[in-house]
């Protein structure tokens, strides 16, 4: 009796739905869901199949999909957000001039020979630079694979990275902050920021200025920034004219005061890193005393912005110190808590998004 009533209800409900039963309706939606999941898995698998030296297309902000070569893959965390998950980044070389940059995983896809031929054979209007890039991608150069250090895997570079060499192409050398004989390096393109030494020449580590001199000096605000430390001008400006942009980039000129401020932050970062993160250094009380002075000086610097603390890697060093499991004799100076306080204040009051993407 109960079965008959149940079957009757099912027939009535089926007739209201145009002859489609509930079970049939659910099954009919399954193929689309399966196809969507399959597409997502195929995209993830394609990303995982990318290897060193593969030709790829990269989507950088303000540019079309651009041919490039894959150099390296690594995982990193946001310097300011202590709760963020790991992000997958790729180091790539852009055709035809081989400027390099770090880009996010969702900005990369494989480049096939058929796609190169299709683009070059298309009658659509395209820029001369993009055509040259696709032409150069047909015969990519031989590469020597780069090696990753333990510090990079920990999302902290103890020294500036040394990029690899391309055959028949000259690369810019990058120098370590730990070396005293730093060399002046010519700047790269807007998307090639990986090293302060490449951007601004000799670091403060190679100068003879003392920490007291650096701490006592005040640097007036750069003409490129307003009273809040933000770039002047409203609206998004085109990447084609980096010289006109009110922000720090390798392509925009820096006045002496801004360079001095960058060197000052690099000096503090170098001293803090050497005192607390160097595996061969024995921490003494003088390190705590000096670190306290450095942190106080950093907190007193006006007009800091996201680019200053991330391009100098100061935020990474402070974060690493702040989360040291054990720091003997830190009760008196409370260095770890001071680092956390600085990171918290930056996360609250500085712009959340970097103005240079992919970094």
Curated annotation (Swiss-Prot):
Outcome, altering residue 94 to A: Reduces the association of set9 with nucleosome and the H4K20me3 levels
Keywords: Chromatin regulator, DNA damage, Nucleus, Phosphoprotein
GO cellular component, one term: NuA3 histone acetyltransferase complex
Annotated GO MF terms: double-stranded DNA binding; histone binding; histone H4K20me3 reader activity; methylated histone binding
Principal location: nucleus
InterPro entries, alphabetized: IOC4-like_PWWP (IPR035503), PWWP_dom (IPR000313)
Keyword Nucleus found: yes
Domain PWWP: 52-114
SUPFAM superfamilies hit by this protein: Tudor/PWWP/MBT
Chain intervals with Polar residues compositional bias: 204-224
Region (Disordered): 1-37, 133-161, 204-255
UniProt superkingdom: Eukaryota
GO annotation, biological process: chromatin remodeling; DNA damage response; regulation of transcription by RNA polymerase II
Stated role: Necessary for DNA damage checkpoint activation. Required for the association of set9 with chromatin and subsequent methylation of H4K20. Associates with H4K20me1 to increase the concentration of set9 on chromatin to perform H4K20me3. H4K20me3 is mainly enriched at heterochromatin and is required for proper heterochromatin assembly.
Domain notes: The C-terminal region mediates association with set9, whereas the N-terminal PWWP domain recognizes H4K20me1.
The protein's name in its UniProt record: PWWP domain-containing protein 1
């Amino acid at each position: 009796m109960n079965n008959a009533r149940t079957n009757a209800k099912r027939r009535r409900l089926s007739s209201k739905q145009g002859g489609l039963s509930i079970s049939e309706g659910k099954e009919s939606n399954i193929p689309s869901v399966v196809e969507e999941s399959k597409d997502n898995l195929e995209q993830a698998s394609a990303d995982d199949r990318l290897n060193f030296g593969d030709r790829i297309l990269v989507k950088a902000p303000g540019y079309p999909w651009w041919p490039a070569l894959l150099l390296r893959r690594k995982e990193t965390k946001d310097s300011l957000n202590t709760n963020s998950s790991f992000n997958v980044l790729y180091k790539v070389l852009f055709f035809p001039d081989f400027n390099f940059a770090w880009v996010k995983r969702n900005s990369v896809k494989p480049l096939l020979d058929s796609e190169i031929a299709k683009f070059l054979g298309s009658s659509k209007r395209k820029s001369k630079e993009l055509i040259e890039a696709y032409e150069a991608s047909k015969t990519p150069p031989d590469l020597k694979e780069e090696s990753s250090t333990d510090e990079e895997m920990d999302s902290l570079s103890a020294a500036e990275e040394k990029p690899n060499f391309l055959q028949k192409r000259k690369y810019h050398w990058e120098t370590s902050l730990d070396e005293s004989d730093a060399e002046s390096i010519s700047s790269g393109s807007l998307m090639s920021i990986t090293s302060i030494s490449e951007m601004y020449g000799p670091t403060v580590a190679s100068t003879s200025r003392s920490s007291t001199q650096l701490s006592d000096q005040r640097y007036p605000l750069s003409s490129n920034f307003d009273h809040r430390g933000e770039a002047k001008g409203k609206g998004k400006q085109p990447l084609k004219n980096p010289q006109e942009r009110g922000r720090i980039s390798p392509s925009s000129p820096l006045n002496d005061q801004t360079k001095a401020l960058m060197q000052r932050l690099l000096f503090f970062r170098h001293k803090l890193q050497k005192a607390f993160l160097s595996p061969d250094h024995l921490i003494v009380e003088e390190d705590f005393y000096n670190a306290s002075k450095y942190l106080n000086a950093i907190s007193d610097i006006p007009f800091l912005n996201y680019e200053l603390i991330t391009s100098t890697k100061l935020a990474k060093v402070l974060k690493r110190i702040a989360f040291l499991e054990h720091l003997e004799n830190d009760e008196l100076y409370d260095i770890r808590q001071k680092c956390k306080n600085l990171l918290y204040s930056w996360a609250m009051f500085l712009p959340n998004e970097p103005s240079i993407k992919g970094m």
